[in-house]
Every structure is written in C-alpha cells, then in structure tokens.
Amino acid sequence: MYEPGTEQINCNGRLIELPTLEVVRPAPKMPSDANIDWLLHIYFTRREFTRCRRLIERELNRHLNPEYLYFVQGLIDREEGNHIEALRHLQKSAELNPRNIETYKEIGRTLYIMGRFSQALGVFREAEQRSSRQDHEIYHYLGELLYRAATTQSQKDVASQQQDEARTYFELAVQSGRKLESYVRLAELYRKDKQYQKAIEILENCLHLTPENSEVLIEISVLYLKINETQKAHDRLAEVVSIERKCSPKGLLAFGAILQSRNDIDGALSKYSQIANAEPEIAELWNNIGLCFFKKQKFIVAISSLRKSVWLSPLNYNALYNLSLIYIASEQYASAFHTLAAAINLRKDNAECYMLLGLCLRKLDDMENAFVALERASSMATGQQGAGRNPLVVLNFALFCYETGRLALSTEQYNRFMSQAQDLLLPTEYKFQATKLKSLLRISNQGNGILLDSADMGESDLGHNRATELLPDELPLEVNAVVSQN
C-alpha cells in the first residue's frame, strides 16, 4: 500500500523502495561563433534596451558579421532620441551589407525625423533603385518627401511637377500595400486639386482597412459637402455618432453646415455652440456662426462673428467675402470696400469680388472706378465656362451702363447676359430686373444691336446680396465656408 509523502510502497507484506526520478538538464553552451541575432531581436521587440546593449557590447568584437548588431544599435539610439549615433550605426550596417534595403529605409526614416528632408529623399530614391520588388513604405516616404518639397517650393512649375510625382508615388503605395497614411495623403492631394470624387473613392477604399475610423468618416462627409451631397454627408456623420457617441469638432462643424444648408439655423447654432465651448479658436466656426446670424438679420452679431473669423485666419477668403456681403447689406460701404480689397488680393481672378467692389464704389459715388471694376468683372465672367460662369455679373454691368448713359454698351452686355443665362435656372427676381432693363432699352430706342428675347431665360438682379445664389462652388455660404479648408 502506498502512503503519500513516503518513498516506499507496501506490496504483499514487502516494502519496496521507490526510485527517485530526477532529470537534470545542463545549460546549453553556445559556441563562440553562434548567431544570436534571434535573441537580440526578442529583446528589442520587448523593448528591453539595456539587455540589448549588453548583448551587443559582448558580441560586437567576436561576431563574424556584426551587421545586425549595428542595425539594432541604431534603432535603439533612435528610440532614445540620439539620432546622430543612430545614423552612424545604421550607416555602418549599410556598409557591411549594401544590399539590405531595410537598412536604407531606416537611414531614410532617421534623416526624415532629423528634418534633413533632401538627404532623406536621396536615400529613399537609392533604396527604390536597389529594391527588386515594389515596397509600399519606400513609395509612401517618397510621396511624403516630394509633397513636402512641393509645399515649400517657390517656383510654381517645379512645385506642380513635384506634387504630380508625389501623387504617383502615393498611388503606387496604395497599390502595393495597405498603409492608412498613404490613402489619407492621396485623398488630400486629390482634394487639393478639387478632384473631390476621386478623393471620396480613395477614402471609401480606406474604410476597408479601418471601417470604424471616425477621422476618415468625417473627411468623407466633408468631401460630400464639397459636391453638395448633403444626405450622404449626413449618413457618414451619423455613423461617426453611432461609433463614438460624440463627434469631434470637425464633425460637429460639418453637421452644423448640413443643418445650415437646410435652413435649420437654430439647429446649426446648437451644434456650433458645442464647438465654441470646447475649441473656440476655429476660424470656420465663427464664419458659419456669422452667416447664421446674417440669416436671422442680426447684422451686428454677424459682423462681430465674421470679424473674429478674419482675426483668427486673416487669409481666409470665404470669411472676407462673407464679411463684405454683410457690410453691403448693412450699408457700410467703406468697410465693405476695404474688406473686398483684401479678398481680391487673395483671389485676383474672382469676378464676383470685382462686381461687389463696383457696387460699393457706385454707392460711394465713385462712378469712374465703379465702371472699371464692373467692366473687369464682366470680362472675367465672360471668359468663364461651365459651372463657373455667373451671368449676374454681366447683368449688373448692363444695368450700371444704362444708369450712366452708356446705352450701346448696356445693350451689348444685356445680349451677353441672355446668351449665358439661356440654359440656367435663375431666381424670378433676376428675371424681373432683366425684363425691366430690356423695356428701358427699347424705350430709349438708342440701343445698338438687337435685344434678345427674355421669355425663356433665367433672371438677374443688381441686388448684391443675391449674388451668392448663383454659384454653389464659389458661394460663401455655410457648406462651402466649412469645407474650404485646404
């Protein structure tokens, strides 16, 4: 019978001694030339840098090929912020094995962190030449460095060429790998070129990688607002709310823009108030708040909000344009003149700014300069094609010419307006003004040329505050004011 805790067993009256089983494994002895790269890799992935350093110091002098030792030493130095030593060790590793592409990539990353972008670009180009396969990391960094170089380039042609090359590399990065940053950067470049549909497609594909990425969903909703797809934008923002229960300021701003575009001013202001409590230093926020109060005919509060927007972002064209509209609506023509001058300095090719400038000068009794401004606006509007054309600019010039006695020129501009507006659906108020001008020109009986019929055309108005109803891409309205951040 066996008794627990004893080393004997009673079997048929006899005591039998139990043998003691004891397995002793001696510690393995590594030969001096054994490869311990695997152990070093384990320590590094565990971030046990002290053990890594001791192991590297012990093995560096007796290792037959210290390439990996120098490589890991460089990575450790970079993690600890010692970039010069990291670069030195990585270069030693590259000298021992010039065919190792990973070493070149780490050298390029180190130079990128150090801010030596031109040198990093050269290293990644060399890595691209040495690589025998498509490497999405190399393509991504090449695109990133070229895009950075394009933003700091003073020569426009060179900057455009670098930006196109950066887009090509980001496209290669997206095709050869699944890196979130590459998708985001490529979409950013498409957005900068106003190719909003392509940017949306890229970000929709990005959602396959991270279906619940709220930042990507918000960016998609903003792009949908760019193309006036407010319902799709709302659906994407609803997904963000269902994921996070709370929207970021950018998402709330887009939510408010959607409500504002649907004339739900109080709902939009409630969204904006949430942003103002958390992050009040957002120029687009105060721009949109100003437009909400403008819709409520509260001019003083609207002007204060838009002036704060301009103060936060002095080069924000939309805020300057909107502020000038409110100044004109409140009959502050001198202030509107100065604000429009600042907006024109930012966009010298915008016909609507020159049109409003001409209206301000007319109200200030400077007829000569008003004629020059309106003439320039008309010539710009005539040269625009497609969705960019604004026949209201031409009609305003025609009305001004009639007012100042230039009947022949007024007739010419009226006919030009008719040819531009014949396939557009314009507000009824504009049609009334155009019909009135046509009647006045016929009564005067001095118009040179035949007046076109206005039976089937859209309309126009000298009313400056109606100019924003024509061009959805250029309007300083709520949606565009939000999504115009570049």
Curated annotation (Swiss-Prot):
Matches recorded under PANTHER family: BARDET-BIEDL SYNDROME 4 PROTEIN, PTHR44186
Role according to the record: May be required for microtubule anchoring at the centrosome. Required for ciliogenesis.
Record carries keyword Hydrolase: no
Keywords associated with the record: Cell membrane, Cell projection, Cilium, Cytoplasm, Cytoskeleton, Membrane, Repeat, TPR repeat
Residue stretches of each TPR repeat: 33-66, 67-100, 101-134, 143-179, 180-213, 215-247, 249-282, 283-316, 318-350, 352-384
Family note: Belongs to the BBS4 family.
GO BP terms, alphabetized: centrosome cycle; cilium assembly; protein localization to cilium
Keyword Nucleotidyltransferase: no
Any one GO MF annotation of this record: protein-macromolecule adaptor activity
GO cellular component: BBSome; ciliary basal body; ciliary membrane; cilium; cytoplasm; pericentriolar material
Gene3D superfamilies (UniProt xref): Tetratricopeptide repeat domain
InterPro entries: TPR-like_helical_dom_sf (IPR011990), TPR_rpt (IPR019734)
Listed name of the protein: BBSome complex member BBS4 homolog
Subcellular location(s) of the protein: Cytoplasm, Cytoskeleton, Microtubule organizing center, Centrosome; Cytoplasm, Cytoskeleton; Cell projection, Cilium membrane
